[in-house]
Swiss-Prot record:
HAMAP family xref list: AroD (MF_00214), Shikimate_DH_AroE (MF_00222)
Highest taxon, organism lineage: Eukaryota
Species name: Arabidopsis thaliana (Mouse-ear cress)
GO MF, one annotated term: NADP binding
InterPro entries in alphabetical order: Aldolase_TIM, Aminoacid_DH-like_N_sf, DHquinase_I, NAD(P)-bd_dom_sf, SDH_C, Shikimate_DH, Shikimate_DH-bd_N, Shikimate_DH_fam
Protein name: Bifunctional 3-dehydroquinate dehydratase/shikimate dehydrogenase, chloroplastic
Length: 603
């Protein structure tokens, strides 16, 4: 289904969940009436889904094979619908290759040892980075001293590398590397046929030729990628390597299609932040290897993660064909700590899942591209929370009442998307705990919420703003919505029975002292850390200030609020609470709450 914008909606409206989630910490304390919505949201048995077109998948490299459960991964590429997956699949666990880029062989030797210590499986020696290069001596040195298998790449300028010298000399160096004991060499498709013919009958038994193609503009259609694979195979390549560029995260689905059905070992990577998933999930979708850098400052291609992140953040060695994929959908999204907490939590309970960053421009096209049971659940952040509600087949009454979804679960039985909102309990409980810990006399009696009768000023009318506003209203607070666009503030205020303000009027709004201020916008988030939605002078009228931003932990708003004498509540408090609610939705297991708090205490 085509979609022209982030807010594009699916044809069928969501219905209320027949069995709403009953969390002892959330729904029991936040009962919003759903009756008002029953006339507008109705059950519909149909839902847009991509049809499947099966084809066999075979992996020829039998080293370290392991069984893969039958799976169907639906992906979309241009106008073509396809299915990744088949029965009786076997696959090769993916390797981690560390690019070594230095201007001298001595530095390269040091970096190969570092790669070994960090946990890489092999190193890519980028010869085109060397300044003073003595081929015979330098190749002998690196092959002898590297503690890991070596892949030699001498990338020319015309394929995105540094080398600008004679082409025949370049190929001679690669042949010499083979003769001296290299494990792999990388040769560009443009010259591969001629090169491979020149070494015919001379290849050592263990030696492999990787034939590579790099596209720095986009990711072609599946038909074009299939044709590219065929051309690479025709050269006599032992291993196929294709690297493309992600214009949209849905482009990665086409690369998963290629690696999943490969007849020979294939490296398929999509460059850029939108392509990060291709590098993390290659073990799941049949990729021969992925690249992990020694540190984040030195990458050989855009979007490469570090070896440390692959192993420690994403638990790369635990990812296999049957691993379920979860992720944080947003734009921006790289700042999110969700992968850190969820992946550690998954590992702590031995849950076979991986949680990744998902930079999504268009939510509808993303959900269509990744509509199989392999992609089991998502967290939604700015700007997709409201659109997410319309993309779900069924929605929890709380999320329906709020008008925003921050958690999506794919139901195992039928693949339908179920929408929830954990922002509400996360933010409200954080603010309540802040008020209770202050000993504020207005917080009694203890049997009621400390928000009762408080004036709560909510900055922002998006998904998080809606969740907090509804939660505060249910707790008996007087809610005021302040937003840059007054019309949006008014719309939310009318929906909950509150008041509306333009954000420009916030500094002059102080009908009483002891109010609660809650920022639910991205103002003050990295990298714009000096932004704040309100003047410091106006903060003296607030007893408590909450900021949903948690990167950085202490924003300018919180710093100035503390200096003004207010209680401050960090977005980390909300983040942890909503995150372990999400964990329970994703896994059906009790959340390791102490672990979540322990992890976030470091940030």
């Amino acid at each position: 289904m085509a979609a022209s914008s982030t807010n594009a909606r699916l044809t069928n409206p969501p219905r209320l969940l027949s069995k709403p989630r009953l969390s002892p910490t959330s729904v029991a304390n936040l009962r919003f009436p759903a009756a008002d919505f029953s006339t507008r949201f109705f059950a519909d048995s149909s839902s847009p889904r991509l049809r499947s077109v099966p084809f066999p998948v075979v992996f020829s490299d039998q080293r370290r094979r392991r069984s893969m459960e039958p799976s169907n991964v639906y992906v979309a590429s241009n106008s073509t619908e396809m299915e990744i997956g088949s029965h009786d699949i076997v696959k090769n666990p993916s390797l981690i290759c560390a690019p070594v880029m230095a201007d001298s062989i001595d530095k390269m030797v040091i970096e190969t040892s570092k790669a070994h210590e960090l946990g890489a499986d092999l190193v890519e020696i980028r010869l085109d980075w060397l300044k003073d290069f003595n081929p015979l001596e330098d190749l002998k040195t690196i092959i002898k001293k590297s503690p890991l298998p070596t892949l030699f790449t001498y990338r020319p300028k015309w394929e995105g590398g540094q080398y600008e010298g004679d082409e025949n000399e370049r190929r001679d160096v690669l042949r010499l590397a083979m003769e001296l004991g290299a494990d792999y060499i990388d040769v560009e498709l443009q010259v591969a046929s001629e090169f491979i013919k020149s070494i015919d009958g001379k290849k050592p038994g263990k030696f492999k030729v990787i034939v590579s193609s790099h596209n720095y503009q986009n990711t072609p259609s599946v038909e074009d990628l299939d044709g590219l694979v065929a051309r690479i195979q025709q050269t006599g390549a032992d291993i196929v390597k294709i690297a493309t560029t992600a214009v949209d995260i849905a482009d990665v689905a086409r690369m998963f299609h290629i690696t999943s059905k490969a007849q020979v070992p294939t490296i398929g990577l999509v460059m850029g932040e939108r392509g990060l998933m291709s590098r993390i999930l290659c073990s799941k979708f049949g990729g021969y290897l992925t690249f992990g850098t020694l540190d984040s400052s030195k990458v050989s291609a855009p979007g490469q993660p570090t070896i440390k992140d692959l192993l420690d953040l994403y638990n790369f060695r635990r990812i296999g064909p049957d691993t379920k994929v979860y992720g944080i959908i947003g734009k921006p999204v790289s700042h999110s700590k969700s992968p850190i907490v969820h992946n550690q939590a998954f590992k702590s309970v031995d849950f076979n899942g991986v949680y990744v960053h998902l930079l999504v421009d268009n939510l509808v096209s993303f959900l269509q591209a990744y509509s199989s049971s392999d992609f089991a659940g998502f967290s939604c952040t700015i700007p997709h929370k409201e659109a997410a509600l319309q993309c779900c087949d069924e929605v929890d009454p709380l999320a329906k009442s709020i008008g925003a979804v921050n958690t999506i679960l794919r139901r195992k039985s039928d693949g339908k998307l179920l929408g929830y909102n954990t922002d509400c309990i996360g933010s409200i409980s954080a603010i309540e705990d802040g008020l209770r810990s202050s000993g504020d006399p207005s917080s009694v009696p203890s049997s009621s919420s400390p928000l009762a009768s408080k004036t709560v000023v909510v900055i922002g009318a998006g998904g998080a703003g809606k969740a907090l506003a509804y939660g505060a209203k249910e707790k008996g607070a007087k809610v005021v919505i302040a937003n840059r666009t007054y019309e949006r503030a008014l719309e939310l205020a009318e929906a909950i029975g509150g008041k509306a303000l333009s954000l420009t009027d916030l500094d002059n709004y102080h009908p009483e002292d002891g109010m609660v201020l809650a920022n639910t916008t991205s103002m003050g988030m990295q990298p714009n850390v000096e932004e704040t939605p309100i003047s410091k002078d106006a903060l003296k009228h607030y007893a408590l200030v909450f900021d949903a931003v948690y990167t950085p932990r202490i924003t300018r708003l919180l710093r100035e609020a503390e200096e003004s004498g207010a209680i401050t509540v960090s977005g980390s408090e909300m983040f942890v609470r909503q995150a372990y609610e999400q964990f329970e939705i994703f896994t059906g297991l009790p959340a390791p709450k102490e672990l979540y708090w322990q992890i976030m205490s470091k940030y």
